[in-house]
A protein has these predicted regions:
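Phosphate-ester processing/binding pockets and catalytic centers
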Residues: 1-247
């Protein structure tokens, strides 16, 4: 069976106090590709992580997690140079363009983030179909790995069921008189797992990706540079929401 692994983490929060919130990560099209990434990524991390241990003389082998916010730029570059060999995806939410009633209501915020993730995941899969990496008429297994801490803070509505419905059956939105067509026309198996980033190299890598995307955008905004051009040099596939400013 065809497989696609989509591994995601967030950077920034959906809040009017922040300009953007980001989801970023890596996509693999086979277990072999995923396992190969983990093996080499783990090797790089093992080579640098002892630098960040505060009590080397009392080492208990429980090294600190390597995160976007706690490593030196030289080590981050080394890791990112490896990550960039794979397919990088990004979802950017322009917080200022999101309706206030969504941001101010926890349930509404959770539903919006759930919608945004479903939109991103569907478009990533559709991109792979368009580029003949996935056959829409053959059985497909979709594995989504997300940082569990992200889930606790955002409270997703129902990511699994929403993905199955949208990918296999399509969705009709009667409020806006529009229909989203299905893109998978055979058996579909969707698995969503929420992982401890301290134990998941996939989520750790996604943390570095999302943090890098957010930093690139904030720097571009400050320097008045074109965001799309900046992102295109790093991300293989991106989606920016909402498209229009809220009124």
């Amino acid at each position: 069976m065809q497989s696609i692994y989509i591994n995601l983490d967030d950077s920034g929060k959906l809040s009017k106090k922040e300009i953007i919130s980001v989801y970023g990560g890596l996509v693999f099209l086979s277990k072999k590709e995923k396992d190969k990434f983990i093996t080499q990524y783990r090797s790089i991390v093992n080579d640098i992580k002892c630098k960040y241990c505060k009590n080397k003389d009392l080492c208990n082998k429980k090294c600190p997690e390597i995160k976007n916010t706690n490593i030196k730029n030289s080590d981050k570059r080394r890791i990112m140079n490896y990550i960039k060999k794979y397919f990088i995806v990004g979802l950017v939410i322009s917080n200022q363009n999101v309706y206030n009633h969504i941001i101010e209501n926890k349930a509404a915020k959770g539903r919006f983030l759930d919608y945004s993730l479903r939109r991103m995941i569907k478009e990533v899969i559709n991109n792979q179909i368009t580029n003949n990496k996935i056959d829409s008429k053959e059985p497909l297994k979709v594995i989504i790995n997300i940082d569990e801490q992200t889930t606790k803070s955002n409270g997703y509505y129902n990511l699994h069921d929403g993905l199955v419905e949208e990918l296999k059956y399509g969705i009709s939105n009667f409020n806006y008189s529009c229909t989203y067509n299905p893109i998978v026309f055979n058996d579909l198996d969707v698995k969503v797992t929420y992982q401890d980033s301290g134990k998941s190299y996939l989520v750790q890598a996604a943390d570095l990706v999302s943090g890098t995307i957010r930093r690139l955008i904030l720097n571009a905004l400050e320097e008045k540079q074109d965001i799309n051009n900046i992102l295109n040099n790093f991300v293989n596939y991106k989606i920016i929401l909402p498209w229009k400013k809220a009124t």
